[in-house]
Every structure is written in structure tokens, then in C-alpha cells.
Amino acid sequence: EMQQKNEDTAASDTGENSIQVFERVEQYLTSNLVQAPEVADSSVSVLIADTMAAEPNVRYWQRMINIGPAVNLLRYDVRAQVQFLKEKLDFEYMRIWQIFSEEMLIQLGEHNVKYNFMLLDQVLDFLVNLKIKPHIEFGFKKHTYFEKVDRSILKIYKDHSLIRLMQNKGFLEDLIKHWTTRYGTAEVETWYIELEKNSVIQETISLEQYFEVFETVYAIFKNYAPGIQIGGAGFSLNVIGKSFEDILRQWKKRKYQPDFVSIYSYPYNYQNKIVDEQRNEYASNESYLADVIYEAHAQMKMAGMTDIPLLVTEWSSTLSNRNCLNDSCYKSAYMVKNMIENYGKVPTLGYWVATDIFSEGIDLNTFLSGGCGLITQNDICKPAYFAMEFMNHLEPYIIGKNENAIVSSRKDGVYFICCHNYKHLNFRYYSRNENEIEIENQQRYFSDNESLQMSFRIRHMNHGKYIVKIFFIGPTHGNVQNEWKQLGYLESLSIYETDYLKRHCQPELSVFYVEAKNNELVIETHIAAQEIQGIVVAEV
């Protein structure tokens, strides 16, 4: 409501809008060093979990992660990070795109086709040898990254390249034959093939053309590897809105239905005519991902497509790879909040994107660039990485959850809790371009700075003493941005300084003991704003 007010009230006669007035007041306060006091009292959250109510843990966030254009996987530094991510976070699938490109030695013209599978083999061999399943995006996704998101990016694509797949049936046949021969049909049948239709940036290809391309690929591939999963179309509900249902209805009438329907989630408003021109396109909705999933399921139901799984193949808090919030603990809290909030709703949630190497550019000479990756170019784990790591520590059974936490157990009296104190962005954020947010002033963009007192009551516990170990990543610990600040935002880091940061970007740990009484164990913890915690509980 606050936000509405600020946007609607025109300010005084000077013609300034309320946000500008606010900015001036704030600049005055900042320059005169008036600090808003940290709110003393924190809000309280209680979660009751029950060991008798255990359900198997479905690790849908661990199923797939976006890696980048196939050509990146020929690089040593990217491979090293992929190996690290497989070893530490054990993703089952990795999603790659742009496998049909001249850099990959595959040239699909309208009439003349030249191709050599040598480089593609190197990429897929690398993944398969690491026991990573490929999730391959066949659409011609451009290798672009954005500094900020505005309407101009909707006009980038004018390429009908998807149709080239239809014109090259012989090539598709060679490709799938080559794969089944090289990797064996059983292996290839575990792969996912996705065909993007209208990504965040709309392509100029009609629905009819899309269906024809999809059916061409589907028929040829299923002929050689019947079990391979082929779906699409990378829908962004913020772009197509209600027409999603109509597209699905038409798809249902076609010869082949997709094995899965895929959507993307990036919180932007494209449809709404944003009245106040001072605003960026960011959607202010705090549960954006949950709403998109809910809406997509609702429309799939109306279209009679309830038996087809819905996959979120890309999700992030932003499309910008020059937004310093990507490097901050805001991002880790955002991720944990969303992974808990959407638990059990979709089989796959593919985070965008694994590494900052994806978003390199000529403008990049800073140590932290505001990229969407889990890891920096110099192999330092960002708070976003620890969001995944903490969630991965959840035990095989889930015994309780609420909006701030999820509690898990295993058979032998070991428990793991993952919790967060996410703070949403406020109206100031919407008046800024994403690449203009100052690393020192992030605080100004959050709804509040209150800490959270959480209390977990776990029922049906054995009597006796338990050890509690709390790992935390937050504004002052394990946070690469904060550690870099201690080094005076030094631009060019030596190997020694990079190693120093690697050692310091780790969760902090505190340990204490609690006693279970009346078959109930109560654990209390205090969580700072934008902090995440992983809590291990074990019988002593």
C-alpha cells in the first residue's frame, strides 16, 4: 500500500514525483550521516515439526541447473567449475543451448548444411563422463546478457532460425543416430530436449511453425530413442499471460503432445502499462515464482493438460548480469525463500545460471560484476551458492515447513533445518536501473532491516541431550561482497588475495546443546535480515 501511495500522490507544485522527493530527503540524511536506527524488536516465527509426519524429500532444485552455450563447455575454466558443482552440489541435469552454431562446427543453412560433430561430442562426453545428464535447449537462444531490462530488449530477435531444423531432417536423423551409437540408447533416453518458442524476448515465429518444427524433431528422435523427453516451449507468463491456455489447447489438438511443458520465471511486468515512467520493469510481487507456477498449472488444467509435467527451466530474481544484488546475501535469502515456498509444486526448478563466466563482457574488469552465477569468475562461492548447499543438506524426510523454514530428518536421529529471513525490495528499487544500484547502499532497497526470532518445536523426539550446529551466511559473514569491502573494493586481486577471499567466504558456525523435554525438542535461533541458516541437530 505504501508503494501505491508513493506512486499515486503527485508531489508539490515543483513537478517532482514522490520518489524524487524521497530521494532528495534521503540524500540529505545520508550526507548528514543520519542513520535510521536498527529496529530493536524482531518478529517471531514458530514452526512445529513432527517426526511422525515424515514425507520423502523431493530435491527438485537439485535436478537441473543452467550452464550456458555449449561452446563455453570447451573452456577449461568453465569445465573446472562444472566439475566443482557436480562434486559439491550434485546436479542431475545441466542445461546447455546454442548447440547449432558455427563455433560448434554446425552450420544449418536453408539448403546447404555443413556439420562436424567433433566439438559437440567433446561437450557431451565431458558431461556424460561426469554422470551429468544433458538437458539440451534446441531453440536458437542468443548468447546475450543484459545490464538492465527494459522494453528495448523485446526487439532483439528477428531470426527465423528455428525453422532451419525443419528444413534439415537429414541432419536431425544423423544427429540422433550419432548419439545413440556413441552413448547407447539407454543413456540418450534419459536426456531432455527442449524447444523454446517465445522466450523472455519474443521471437517472430508463428505457433503453427513452432508446432511443425517440434513435430519434426519429435518424430525423428522418438524413432531412435523412444524414451527421450522432448518438450517446450520456454514460456514466460509475463509475456504471454492468458494466451498460455490457448496455446496449450491448440497443442493438445496436434499429433504429438510435449513430454513436458517448460516455463521461465523472471519477475518483470511486460504487460502492465507502467504509468510512472520513473519505474523500471521489475514486478513488485513478493511471491512471483509461486504465482507463476500456480497460474501455469491453472491454465494447464483448463486446457486439459494435467497429465503433463510442468518444469521451470529458468528462474532467477533478475535477468541483469550487472546487478550487485546478485552477489549479495539478498540473493541467497531470495533463493532459499523460493525453494521452500515452491517445494512440492514442480518436479524441476532450473536455476539461472551456474557461473558468472557466462556473463563476461568487455566492460568487465571488476572482481564482482553482479552476474547471476553461483560462483564468481575467480571460483569464489557467492551467497547464492550456499543457498543451494544449505538446501542440499536436507535429510531424506521432510517433517515440517513454513514460509521461513523447512525441517528434515533421517532414520538415525539426525535432523537438518534450512531457514531464511528474506526481505523484499521496496519502491526505491523500482525507481532505479538494475545496473545502477550502489554496492555500499543496498540497505536502502529493502522493505526493512528487522531480524527474526525463530523457534522450532520438534515433536516425538527421544529424551536426552542434542547438539545443535548452526551454519550461517549473512550480511557480515561468509559474504563475498562484505569480504571484498574489507579489502577496500580492490580492483585487481592477486592470487594471494583471491585465496584469502576463498578461505573467508565460508559459513560461520556456532554450536550449543539442548535437552528434549516431554518428547519435544525446542531450538531457538536469531536470524539477521537477508541471512540464511543451515542447522544440524543430532542426538548426543
Describe the function of each predicted region.
Residues 89-282:
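Substrate-binding cleft and catalytic face of glycoside hydrolase catalytic domains
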Residues 6, 12, 22-29, 33, ...:
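C-terminal beta-sandwich/jelly-roll accessory domains of carbohydrate-active enzymes
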Residues 49-52, 72-86, 178, 241-251, ...:
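Short, acidic/polar
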Residues 58, 71-75, 104-105, 271, ...:
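Short, solvent-exposed loop/turn elements at domain surfaces
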Residues 1-90, 529:
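Mature N-terminal, pre-catalytic/accessory segment of carbohydrate-active enzymes
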Residues 81, 268-323, 338, 344-356, ...:
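Glycoside hydrolase catalytic-domain groove-lining segments
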